[in-house]
């Protein structure tokens, strides 16, 4: 949890339908394994204590009591584990049955978050058993005598890392036009968890992946999606255990479908908060959310997530070429506007290196977009003390192949005069030696541009201006 990184786990146990004792033991084992691997946020699927596919057994008191007893067992026996857990179960509140996520940590239930949107179309009929928790806001007394909130609008805030603020939604909630995760994020949630039981249809995995990725991007948040898998009844549906962990549109980790197990990745909470600060249109609203504190130990987080050493350069050749063409077109369109507005020609200094080559290619593309002859581009080579035959030959061939006007100005004599004027020893190859040549080249380009009614085009970094 140092430097803003928090390890998360999305867990799919191989449950037995309606066997709450078996499921509780299995879930407890996976909770222990997750924390052994350093996970601090551990998310299980929707209704995992009973199974999603219990159908009318959900209406039986024995199953509901078994689920409640199983929850209390998990809470008690996980008290020594340093993590916050999210486990799904059916829960009766005020005589009605809700599909809830129980949230607990260090032997204490922090709250119950009910599902808001109950699918009752196509292959789904949740409204047969459950009621919506969209308007639920009450206190529930648990078997141990503790009273906890049952409310959709709960935020779980880490005392040791206040930027770690977690909001909860369940399965269908994400698939609706107005998911609860939107209000959670606007109330400050940096991490969103989804306890799901999403069945498989041909092509549904792609839609699910895009949904999770898109929601994390839209809300500048991390999104942990844990779905039901093996063990559920296959009478009507098949569940694949498709788990996903995403961060601001990037899929950090994704499980292989049609299995069970634990998916891990690390979430960069500080990065998410920094991105929200930069986006001035991301305005947190004064919500009615209730904040509930929990504690975690601050420990080193071993990073397993992929860190791209070249984040702007796609490894796939086709995508790389597409990205390069996009960059070239963006630059060329910007230059095209200036050329059309001024009616000017262009002057480009060519050394044979990457920067000047890019400047010339962008200029050529801009002239093509304007429908202008490349002879309006003056390409200038300015050999100096360090110019090699290779870079010089590259520069000349490039200019000739693109059909630009070729001009050569040797700067050695003028730079030597300048060295004499300022008392610089030509044998001392220091910053003055290097920058004197660069400034001489810039002066030449500016003067030629004045003569030709042209703009000087170059790729430049702020450092060059120092």
Region spans (language model):
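N-terminal beta-alpha lobe that positions the nucleotide/phosphoryl donor
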Residues: 40, 51, 77, 82-83, ...
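Generic hydrophobic alpha-helical scaffold/packing signal
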Residues: 328, 332-336, 364, 378, ...
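ATP-dependent adenylation/pyrophosphate-handling site
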Residues: 193, 346-350, 354-396
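A conserved beta-strand->alpha-helix junction
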Residues: 262-264, 293-311, 372-432, 438, ...
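A glycine-rich phosphate-binding loop feature that marks nucleotide/adenosyl-phosphate handling sites
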Residues: 91, 346-356, 414-415, 459-465
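Nucleotide-activated chemistry modules centered on ATP-dependent adenylation/adenylyltransferase
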Residues: 193, 199, 220, 415-424, ...
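Alpha-helix C-terminal capping segments
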Residues: 217-218, 361-367, 447-452
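Enzyme catalytic cores with a strong preference for nitrogen-chemistry domains
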Residues: 1-349, 365-374, 406
């Amino acid at each position: 949890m140092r430097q803003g990184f928090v390890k998360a786990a999305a867990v799919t146990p191989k449950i037995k339908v309606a066997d709450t004792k078996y499921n509780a033991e299995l879930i407890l084992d996976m909770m222990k394994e997750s924390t052994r691997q350093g996970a601090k946020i551990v998310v299980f699927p929707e209704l995992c204590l009973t199974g999603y596919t219990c159908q009318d057994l959900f209406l039986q008191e024995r199953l509901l009591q078994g689920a409640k007893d199983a929850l209390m067992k998990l809470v008690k026996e996980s008290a020594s584990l340093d993590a916050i857990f999210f486990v799904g179960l059916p829960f009766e509140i005020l005589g009605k049955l809700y599909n809830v996520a129980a949230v607990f940590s260090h032997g204490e239930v922090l709250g119950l978050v009910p599902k808001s949107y109950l699918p009752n179309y196509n292959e789904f009929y949740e409204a047969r058993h459950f009621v919506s928790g969209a308007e639920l806001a009450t206190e529930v007394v648990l078997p141990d005598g503790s009273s906890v909130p049952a409310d959709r609008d709960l935020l779980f805030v880490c005392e040791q890392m206040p930027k770690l603020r977690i909001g909860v939604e369940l399965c269908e909630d994400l698939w609706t036009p107005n998911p609860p995760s939107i209000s959670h994020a606007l109330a400050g949630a940096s991490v969103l968890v989804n306890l799901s039981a999403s069945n498989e249809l041909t092509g549904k995995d792609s839609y699910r992946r895009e949904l999770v990725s898109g929601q994390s991007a839209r809300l500048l948040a991390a999104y942990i999606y844990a779905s039901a898998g093996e063990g559920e009844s296959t009478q009507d549906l098949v569940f694949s255990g498709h788990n996903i962990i995403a961060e601001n549109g990037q899929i950090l980790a994704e499980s292989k479908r049609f299995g069970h197990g634990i998916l891990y990745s690390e979430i960069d909470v500080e990065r998410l908060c920094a991105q929200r600060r930069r986006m001035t249109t991301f305005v947190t609203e004064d919500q009615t959310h209730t904040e509930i504190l929990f504690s975690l130990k601050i420990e080193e987080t071993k990073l397993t997530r992929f860190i791209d050493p070249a984040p702007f350069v796609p490894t796939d050749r086709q995508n790389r070429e597409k990205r390069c063409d996009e960059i070239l077109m963006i630059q060329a369109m910007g230059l095209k506007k200036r050329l059309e507005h001024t009616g000017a020609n262009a002057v480009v200094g060519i050394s044979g290196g990457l920067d000047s080559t890019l400047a010339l290619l962008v200029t050529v593309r801009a002239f093509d977009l304007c429908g202008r002859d490349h002879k309006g581009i003056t390409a200038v080579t300015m050999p100096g003390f360090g110019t090699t035959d290779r870079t010089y030959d590259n520069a000349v061939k490039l200019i000739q192949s693109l059909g630009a006007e070729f001009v050569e100005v040797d700067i050695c004599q003028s730079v030597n005069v300048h060295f004499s004027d300022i008392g610089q020893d030509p044998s001392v190859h220091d910053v003055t030696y290097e920058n004197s040549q660069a400034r001489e080249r810039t002066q030449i380009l500016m003067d030629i541009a004045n003569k030709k009614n042209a703009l000087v085009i170059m790729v430049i970094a702020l450092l060059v201006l120092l």
